[in-house]
Amino acid sequence: MGIEEKIPGGFLLTTVEKAVGWVRKSSLWPATFGLACCAIEMMATGAGRYDLARFGMEVFRASPRQADLMIVAGRVSQKMAPVLRQIYDQMPEPKWVLAMGVCASSGGMFNNYAIVQGVDHVVPVDMYLPGCPPRPEMLMHAILELHEKIKSTKLGVHAVREAHEREEAAKHALPTHSMKGLLR
């Protein structure tokens, strides 16, 4: 016998953080940053067959100032990295980043000086999506997993501290090509 049974109908008991998390997850506005073949699959996800609109993502934003989710789809060159960081910095808080595909996550098969070995060395990444390229169903699953992460996001000072810690950890992370013995 809890308080829920004593309250008349039409009332909902929750915390402010949970209510804000529910609202934020229900209205993500993605910014496109399609650089390679993963961008084709990302565009297919927005088409009628998969219909991202049912998850509150009606339109991909061309302006970073109107977006709160950056989907980095494809490989990032060393010359493109500062542009990626500039677009990330222009996005309003709260913001999330999804690395789509092996190239965005770890540099993929392009282990050379011209390709960034993981976009997490440029911006903090909230969700990694493997695949070469990942199917639209996989992107939708990653977005739904990101929704769950967004629902549990902290507010206020705790959120700022958490974001700064994530960004500092990403800046000081060991490059993927320096890690030895990963496949053994």
From Swiss-Prot:
It is found in: Cell membrane. Binds 1 [4Fe-4S] cluster. Its cofactor is [4Fe-4S] cluster. Signal peptide: none annotated. [4Fe-4S] cluster binds at C37, C38, C103, C132. The keyword Cytoplasm does not apply. PROSITE patterns: COMPLEX1_20K (PS01150). Coiled coil: none annotated. It comes from the Bacteria. Its EC number is 7.1.1.-. Keywords: 4Fe-4S, Cell membrane, Iron, Iron-sulfur, Membrane, Metal-binding, NAD, Quinone, Translocase, Transport. One of its GO terms (molecular function) is iron ion binding. Residues 164-184 are annotated as: Disordered. It catalyses: a quinone + NADH + 5 H(+)(in) = a quinol + NAD(+) + 4 H(+)(out). InterPro entries: NADH_UbQ_OxRdtase-like_20kDa (IPR006137), NADH_UQ_OxRdtase_20Kd_su (IPR006138). One of its GO terms (biological process) is electron transport coupled proton transport. The keyword Transport applies. Transmembrane segments: none annotated. It is a peripheral membrane protein. GO terms for cellular component: plasma membrane; respiratory chain complex I. It is an enzyme of class 7 (translocase). Belongs to the complex I 20 kDa subunit family. NDH-1 shuttles electrons from NADH, via FMN and iron-sulfur (Fe-S) centers, to quinones in the respiratory chain. The immediate electron acceptor for the enzyme in this species is believed to be a menaquinone. Couples the redox reaction to proton translocation (for every two electrons transferred, four hydrogen ions are translocated across the cytoplasmic membrane), and thus conserves the redox energy in a proton gradient. NDH-1 is composed of 14 different subunits. Subunits NuoB, C, D, E, F, and G constitute the peripheral sector of the complex. This is NADH-quinone oxidoreductase subunit B. It comes from Acidothermus cellulolyticus (strain ATCC 43068 / DSM 8971 / 11B). The lineage of its organism: Bacteria, Bacillati, Actinomycetota, Actinomycetes, Acidothermales. The gene is nuoB.
